[in-house]
Regions:
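Alpha-helix initiation/capping motif
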Residues: 49, 53, 129-132, 220
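Short, compositionally biased low-complexity segments
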Residues: 30-39, 110-113, 202-211
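PAPS-dependent sulfation machinery
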Residues: 1-80, 213
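PAPS-dependent sulfotransferase catalytic domain
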Residues: 56-73, 88-90, 96-186
């Protein structure tokens, strides 16, 4: 969705705006092609500049035109995945012709705060994890409330459960999506059929993508503000409910 939204003038130097121009002939998609030749993104990126004032739903339907043939040819259940982490825009939420399910992926508060406060620790800031802790609490509580009200099936998935117990977690997720689990899912980069133009650079790292990997650096650290904050029952309950309960509805 972020790539489809009309870029603001102040963001003309950023990826979404640049991909409407020459960058689409340089940046590679995870399918292996440069963006301009990607069977999914290529036609859309060429079409967008003259249609950027169209509603987001129209743009999404244009994008899905390039995905639909692969989905129908597979002969099994297929899902189009939109995974921009800060995105709560669902233009098709009320479209009766589409089945929409939500996977709510949440990272343990201690791991998230440790990662977000890294720069503050290097600069010697006092309590560098305090602001990230408040942000995790605010965002996670808000997202849980929004998803409880969205009226769609929601699968609660903990980042730690996925990374530390990948096969068990993926089998449970596949069952929920009516998909058959395949061992190849445990090697995400090598077996991916995705079309991703922006995001974590590890998506192109074949070695690191050969398995699902978890950075457990935070576990070796001493007591942090996030670890101490888990002594507060409401925060501990939210972290447990979103990350470790394996709850779905």
């Amino acid at each position: 969705v972020r790539l489809l939204e009309k870029p603001a003038l102040k963001d003309s130097h950023r990826g979404p705006a640049q991909l409407r121009g020459t960058l689409r002939h340089q940046r590679h998609c995870t399918c292996g092609e440069v963006a301009a030749k990607c069977p999914v993104w290529g036609p859309v990126l060429a079409w967008l500049p003259s249609h950027d004032n169209q509603p987001l739903a129209v743009k999404l339907k244009k994008l899905m035109e390039g995905i639909a043939p692969d989905a129908s040819a597979s002969g099994s259940a297929s899902w189009v995945v939109e995974s921009y982490q800060d995105d709560f825009k669902l233009p098709f939420l009320e479209d009766p012709s589409l089945e929409i399910r939500v996977i709510h992926l949440t990272r343990d508060v201690r791991s998230w705060v440790h990662s977000r406060s890294r720069d503050g620790r290097k600069r010697g800031h006092w309590l560098p994890g305090f602001i990230p802790l408040l942000r995790w609490w605010r965002m996670s509580a808000r997202h849980e409330m929004q998803l409880n009200r969205c009226g769609k099936p929601v699968f609660r998935l903990g980042y730690e459960e996925l990374a530390l117990r990948p096969e068990q977690t993926l089998r449970r997720l596949c069952d929920w999506l009516n998909l058959e689990f395949a061992e190849a899912m445990l090697a995400p980069v090598a077996q991916s059929s995705s079309h991703i133009l922006a995001g974590n650079r590890v998506r192109f790292d074949a070695e690191r993508g050969s398995t699902i990997y978890y950075d457990a650096e935070w576990m070796a650290m001493g007591a942090s503000v996030a670890q101490l904050a888990l002594a507060w029952p409401p925060l501990a309950a939210l972290n447990r409910r979103l990350v470790y309960s394996a709850k779905r509805r």
